[in-house]
Amino acid sequence: MASFKIVIVCLALLVAVASARRRDMMSDDELDYHYSKRGIPCACDSDGPDIRSASLSGIVWMGSCPSGWKKCKSYYSIVADCCNQ
């Protein structure tokens, strides 16, 4: 009887996994919009030395900059980079 229950549970899981819908892929424009809204603004080297009057044109990315973005801060950090497009 216990093996019958195990078979039923396994079949139910198989049906649930097989019928799961895949999420639609985002277009490049949607990805750019979401990338630009992600993260914390940071000051690039081109924004000037004064952080209070800087326009904060960069965005902090954990790890490294994604494709299409470039590192805009001169110092090196293992944890995060200040990137802009």
From Swiss-Prot:
GO cellular component entries: extracellular region
Signal peptide boundaries: 1-20
Propeptide intervals in chain numbering: 21-36
SUPFAM superfamilies: Defensin-like (SSF57392)
Disulphides: C42-C82, C44-C72, C65-C83
Tissue: Expressed in ectodermal glands and in clumps outside of the extodermal layer. Is not expressed in nematocytes. In adult female tissues, shows similar expression levels in mesenteries (gametes-producing tissue), tentacles, pharynx and physa.
A Pfam family this chain is assigned to: Toxin_4
Molecular function GO terms recorded: sodium channel regulator activity; toxin activity
InterPro entries membership: Myo_ane_neurotoxin_sf
Subcellular location: Secreted
Keywords on record: Cleavage on pair of basic residues, Disulfide bond, Ion channel impairing toxin, Neurotoxin, Secreted, Signal, Toxin, Voltage-gated sodium channel impairing toxin
Family, similarity comment: Belongs to the sea anemone sodium channel inhibitory toxin family. Type II subfamily.
Function of the protein: Binds to site 3 of voltage-gated sodium channels and inhibits the inactivation process. Is highly active on DmNav1/TipE (drosophila) and is only extremely weakly active on rat Nav1.4-beta-1/SCN4A-SCN1B, and on human Nav1.5-beta-1/SCN5A-beta-1. This reveals high specificity for arthropod over mammalian channels. In vivo, when released into the medium, this recombinant toxin induces impaired swimming, paralysis and death of the crustacean A.nauplii within several hours. Also causes paralysis of cherry shrimps immediately after injection at very low doses.
Note: Nv1 toxin seems to be encoded by 8 different genes. 4 of them code for identical precursors, whereas 4 others code for very similar precursors. In the genome draft, 6 additional loci are also correlated to Nv1 toxin, but they are not predicted to be functional genes. This high similarity may be explained by concerted evolution.
Protein name: N.vectensis toxin 1 4
